[in-house]
Amino acid sequence: MSAVKRISVSKYKTFMFDIEGTTTPIVFVAENLFPYIRKSLKTHIEETWESEETKKDVLSLKEQAEQDANSQSDFKDAPQINIDSQQSVIDNVVYNMDKDRKMTALKQLQGHMWRSGYESGNILGEVYDDAFDFFERIKKQGKNIYIYSSGSVQAQKLLFQYSTHGNLLPYFVDHFDTSNIGNKLEKSSYVKILERTGIPNSDILFLTDNIGEAIAAREAGIDSVLSVRPGTMKLPEDHTFEAVTSFEHLEF
């Protein structure tokens, strides 16, 4: 199916966006957010060591490291933390990032660091120009926008509040993530969104780069348009969704 034809979206009253690969380059997290943690970790630990927030972060990391040591998991060699040693915390965080762990304690610290990075201007949430323009066109039509991403609601809000196009939070009615809604590859998550918002499924258009998510949304009666961007997954030749390389191809 062609990814360049113009598609009318005038019948939809609500637009729900994925982030990575849709509004934002798919490499943004890997090439901007995670490198920021590695680059700023030592300074962050040194400068916030006495803060209650960092003390809680360190305690959570310490508890996880102790659980790892007493387990038979692949992480039983995780560096242990001495609460009097900043270097032990740094070593533990680097170890867990190298292992690409999704543990709560690590995500908590990273979230606090990203917040500081955004607030200080060291991180800007990258939003495609055509995505921003589409947000503008949607609002001019008096229609609503929601965000549904696997990234936490906090991370979503930081990206859009401190974006390359300024504070975009006023454009959005609400934010959904996998913790408050569920897995994006499951029909039940989209049913839950319909129940929570009270919006008829025929009124919503979902925009995502992931065909598996589009299939799950379709099972709940929600239409989707696939976002084809640099680095997004190649679509199967026989897929039956509309697809665009830019939101300028969507028109009212």
From Swiss-Prot:
InterPro entries in the record = Enolase-ppase_E1, ENOPH1_eukaryotes, HAD-like_sf, HAD-SF_hydro_IA, HAD_sf
Q: Matching CDD domains, A to Z? A: HAD_EP (cd01629)
- Gene3D superfamilies, sorted: 1.10.720.60, HAD superfamily/HAD-like
Swiss-Prot/TrEMBL keywords: Amino-acid biosynthesis, Cytoplasm, Hydrolase, Magnesium, Metal-binding, Methionine biosynthesis, Nucleus
Q: Annotated pathway, please?
A: Amino-acid biosynthesis; L-methionine biosynthesis via salvage pathway; L-methionine from S-methyl-5-thio-alpha-D-ribose 1-phosphate: step 3/6; Amino-acid biosynthesis; L-methionine biosynthesis via salvage pathway; L-methionine from S-methyl-5-thio-alpha-D-ribose 1-phosphate: step 4/6
Entry-linked Pfam families: Hydrolase (PF00702)
What is this enzyme's class at the first EC digit? hydrolase
Name the coenzymes or cofactors required.
Mg(2+)
Cofactor binding, note field:
Binds 1 Mg(2+) ion per subunit.
Example of a GO biological process term? L-methionine salvage from methylthioadenosine
Q: Which residues does the record give as Mg(2+) binding sites?
A: 18, 20, 209
What stretch or stretches form a coiled coil here? none
Q: What coarse category fits the chief subcellular location reported for this protein?
A: cytoplasm
User: What Gene Ontology molecular function terms does this protein carry?
Assistant: acireductone synthase activity; magnesium ion binding
Q: Binding residues for substrate, per the UniProt record?
A: 149-150, 184
What GO CC terms are in its UniProt record?
A: cytoplasm; nucleus
SUPFAM superfamilies (alphabetical): HAD-like
Enzyme Commission code(s) on record: 3.1.3.77
Where's it found, cell-wise?
A: Cytoplasm; Nucleus
Q: Which reaction does it catalyse?
A: 5-methylsulfanyl-2,3-dioxopentyl phosphate + H2O = 1,2-dihydroxy-5-(methylsulfanyl)pent-1-en-3-one + phosphate
Q: Subunit structure, per the record?
A: Monomer.
- Family label: Belongs to the HAD-like hydrolase superfamily. MasA/MtnC family.
Q: Which NCBIfam families match?
A: enolase-ppase, HAD-SF-IA-v1
Q: What is this protein called?
A: Enolase-phosphatase E1
Species in which this protein is naturally found? Naegleria gruberi (Amoeba)
